[in-house]
Amino acid sequence: MIKIVALIKRRADVTLDTFREYYEHSHAPLFQRSIPDDVAAVITHYVQNHAVRLGDGTTDAPYDCITEIGFDDIEWMRTWSRWYLGEEGKVLRDDEERFMDTSRRVVIVTDEHRIGTDV
């Protein structure tokens, strides 16, 4: 399985709680309704992995969320990328500027290999 894995940091003026609320309840629905059916059909999953505060919460994790978008193969990932980086995908990119520090985002294309559940 091919995945786009993005390490996301919130903007400095956005609290962690506000970031999570916006990402889950505003951006994710925008993601779902903005993507045309032919592009949505190539996505196998969309997952937000939010950082958990540990200890007293006085220190921030280096990233606030790790987002995964999965595809069955590299061509399907390219279909998504063409849409996202094109004019129609601008609606998502513009929305990301509202709550993400996009200058700190790290994006990696990965090939997932599940090792097993007994490890």
Residue ranges and their predicted role:
Residues 1-119:
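Macromolecular interaction modules
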